[in-house]
Amino acid sequence: MTLAEVQGLKIQQDGHTSHIPSFEEFVTRAKELKMPLLVELKPHGAEPENYVDLFVQKMKELGVEKDYPTMSLDLSVMEKVEKKAPEIKTGYVIPIQFGQFENASVDFFAIEDFSYQEDLVTQAHEMKKELYVWTINDEQKLTAYLQRPVDGIITDEVAEAQSLKKNLKKNKTYFDRFLSLVSLSTSEE
């Protein structure tokens, strides 16, 4: 299928009908909603040789190169983006992390919830990188991660995460947070 054909496809979910938007349409709508985006590149192997150049050009054309972090499972793509446009915050998605992080030329690592250990946060910070966890959609896990030293939480439940964060800041003393963490850690076992 061509890009135009894909963008013309109708999609339906939960009684709603729409079409697959272009990247430009998606970014335009996100800007209107003041919704920050985390862009994930998912190369499939048949990209043009100038794929990274095209992406960087599009981010700059849309004026979001300093606003929207970008990540991928493909480390080489992210290192190319970092080299060509250091102003774009780049991340390496790691589905399962054991041991030490690879010394990668990116700004952050994104690890799956399953792989999270607090020493990974320390390790990332020592490498001058941030650590994000994904995909955290459960209220209990969101609450726990909001009280851990991670730099970012990737979630589909943005409004819920923002509400939980606001409530934690507003209503909790340090002792309350400690009790909450103890309660969460015993319920996770």
Where are the predicted features?
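C-terminal active-site rim and adjoining tail of enzyme catalytic domains
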Residues: 15-20, 91-189
